[in-house]
Amino acid sequence: MPLTEDQQKRPPSAGISVDDVGRSTRSAAPQPPHASSQEWLPALLKRILPSTPSQVVQRVMLTVLVASVVILCIANPIFRQSDNLLNVLQQAAMVGIIAGGMQLMIISGGFDLSVGIVAAAAGCAAAYVSLQHGIAIGILVGLVAGLLAGFVNGILVAKIGINPFVATFGTQAVVTGLLYAATGATPIAPLPSGWTDLGLKNVAGISFASLTFVVVILILLFVLRCTLFGQHIYAVGSNKEGSRRAGIHVDRVLIAVYAIGGLCAAIAGILLVSISGIGSPATGTQWALLAIAAVIIGGTPLTGGVGGISSAVIGILSLTVLTNALNLYSVSAYWQPALTGTAVLLAVGFEAFRSARKR
């Protein structure tokens, strides 16, 4: 049938029905974004913002540390000198390494009061053996001594079931007596010149002790975050009986953790020998308490099951910056223990307050 004149003049679109127009409009309209694309911001904030009291304490202490460093750099020209900043890092190295090992023990639900005297004993053992058999053999003997002391502590805590405070306090007393009897309470000196050569080594101005500190911290960080053993440490610290029922060898985990703590103490003691050039039985008397204080100030509670290596690093750097600032402003060293104790009380009190509010 031929088209009429009106039909020939009508545009092609006029033949489209209303339903067709509606369907095309709906198909062209932008669709709402998928639900997952709307959830990225809350997920990101959950990862960034602290969600537990210990994380809050850690972020607060990190903020205080950064602010203190910035203020001291502005207020004191000596503090911001590169030599002084590198000196701060070296001063933090020995106790920082011990604090790294202490962090693992505290996460597992314990701690070690003997690490200071173990560090001194390992240093003296390394120094004494090096006189007859060379520095390399001396260092090896010192490391084995620290590892053995930590292993004994682990056996006392895990296998015999002695409270960590009692076990490590007893170990501290035994090692102190043996060390002073063996050395006559006198330093071991003079030592081969290779010791001081080792202590003076540096890379781009960063001392050997500081580099060792960084390497040890990175290794411990990897162990906690990237290994099954690290997951077991958290599990044991959270619930020992539950971990046993889950098939975790709790005793092995605890023994390994205390052995690592003893090894870290030995590394610190040997580093001190390389810096000072002597093996002294009187060194490290306050290292255990400083290491525990550093972990607590960094935001890790003594309850176990939570925390990270960053807590130990933040804590020890905070204490070292405080000590350095006191020295720069000629404040008596007697104030340092009082200020350290105050920082510990504030950190623990703040965490307890946050926990009470959440309940």
Protein language model regions, located:
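Single transmembrane alpha-helix segments in multi-pass membrane proteins
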Residues: 67-132, 155-162, 292-295, 299-309, ...
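Membrane-interfacial amphipathic/re-entrant helices at transmembrane-helix boundaries
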Residues: 3-99, 132-137, 248, 256
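Transmembrane alpha-helices
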Residues: 249-273, 285
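Transmembrane helix-bundle core of multi-pass membrane transporters
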Residues: 160, 164-227, 253-256, 275-284
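Transmembrane alpha-helical segments in multi-pass inner-membrane proteins
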Residues: 265, 275-341
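Structural signal for alpha-helical transmembrane segments and their membrane-water exit/capping regions
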Residues: 64-81, 108, 179-187, 222-228
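Alpha-helical transmembrane segments within multi-pass membrane transporters and channels
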Residues: 133-172, 314-315
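Membrane-helix/interface signature in polytopic inner-membrane proteins
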Residues: 219-259
